[in-house]
A protein has these predicted regions:
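Nucleotidyltransferase catalytic core that binds NTPs
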Residues: 1-182
Length: 182
């Protein structure tokens, strides 16, 4: 929300820059696109290639943030890292802000009952089947978007319709069970 408010205040485009990483995710690329579609002006998805992984942090600031994205304001979390061996962080972004003509907004960590709210914590909650708490901490319902597959039609014996869906690759899936969906 901070980047959206900044863009409205400064009359500039709001841009979310996301890395397409090969790991378990809370949103597939398609879900992220749909989620942000009416919220930001642009979503830039950067493939997390070997070249990107080995790029030095200052080179990322210069080539990606400055020359390609023309960043005017950057919003990151306190534990944000980037560049080769994660050498870049919010302090480095702040250090080079004047040189490259942008400002930095660092979002402090949020906590729930003395536990840091993070993607790792949300993943743990989902894998433990605590979808209601995951939803509360996410601020939106956790979704799984996929294709319906024909199963053994066992749902008919439960007295209400059910669907079997193909699990998207790399998507965090709650434990096996029957979930109420809308």
């Amino acid at each position: 929300n901070r980047i959206i408010k900044y863009a409205q205040k400064e009359d500039c485009d709001s841009v979310v820059c996301a890395f397409d990483m090969d790991r378990d995710c809370l949103m597939t690329n398609e879900e992220r696109r749909a989620f942000l579609e009416d919220k930001v002006d642009y979503l830039i998805e950067i493939p997390f290639t070997r070249e990107m992984m080995e790029m030095e942090a200052e080179k990322f600031i210069d080539e990606i943030l400055h020359k390609k994205l023309h960043a005017a304001h950057i919003v990151v979390g306190t534990d944000f890292n980037f560049g080769h061996e994660k050498r870049g962080n919010h302090q480095m972004l702040e250090k080079y802000a004047a040189k490259y003509g942008y400002t930095v907004d660092v979002v402090e960590k949020a906590y729930y009952k003395d536990r840091e709210i993070s993607s790792t914590y949300i993943r743990e909650l989902l894998l433990d089947g605590n979808v209601p708490l995951a939803n509360k901490l996410l601020g939106y319902p956790y979704e799984i978007t996929s294709v319906v597959e024909h199963g053994q039609q066992l749902g008919r014996t439960l007295g209400f319709p059910t669907m079997n869906i193909a699990w998207p690759k790399r998507k965090i899936i709650p434990p096996r069970g029957v979930y109420l969906c809308r």
